[in-house]
């Protein structure tokens, strides 16, 4: 199994990665596959893109890719609430709050110039009838702003107090809270790059179902044609098949599901409708496993080639090495 390529980190990031890897408060637990309950798994990587000691595995029965062992509930909460998470996931040497204020302000300025996002275009193209929208993990409220501009009633829940307060300054009602704090019913509930962070998405879907009148929209970085950016904050890496299987067995039917290729991640977009008739989506497990095993070995070959090239080019000319090696996209298919 290859060592997943680690990004070039700032000194602050390196410091906090080491704090995580050597922190006795961080506990891990082994789990069975969320999708099929199998314990038969192949280890793909032993670390993530930041250097966290975190294994990523492929279920040999159904093809779901996930972290295992993964952080326990208490350790996950500690990770997100402490300074470990944000001080690694932002690249500068300044504090998280300083970097986040700069980032979110800049992002909003760009957004206001061109208020557009792929998931919103997809929802509009489906001609749905809905009025009120709830977003779980609403961050600074940009996603909800799109719906507000379209005349919809919006409400969000965001675990970060800083981000929920920022959203309010932009006229978006975002409550500082998460899944267990949701109240009321909504025509449309959206989870934009949140589902992959959950420890148990099935439990969350069962809780959310009672708050959904009609539709559920999910956007996740997926594994379709290549491996996504492997990181310890993403507990699962879904394909069209595995996402469909998990969501439909929780009382939803598929209205739309597709993906778009990106430089780093394949993005999966899916709309589901609440239904009382549960018909779990079925797919060919063996083919799924074969597909991702093939993608994995192709990826390993790319890693090997890049490392060999680096060694050779480093001896010739260090600057020439950087230019040539960057041509190879390690995360490509």
Feature locations, PLM:
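A short His-aromatic
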Residues: 193-197
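Short, glycine-/aromatic-enriched active-site segment of Class I SAM-dependent methyltransferases
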Residues: 11-14, 216-247
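Conserved N-terminal segment of class I S-adenosyl-L-methionine
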Residues: 1-188, 192, 202-205, 266-268, ...
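Conserved S-adenosyl-L-methionine
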Residues: 41-48, 252-262
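A short glycine-rich, Lys/Arg-flanked "PGG" loop and its adjoining helix->strand segment in the class I
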Residues: 202-217
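Flexible glycine/acidic-rich beta-alpha junction loops that bind and position SAM and/or redox cofactors
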Residues: 224-229, 263-269
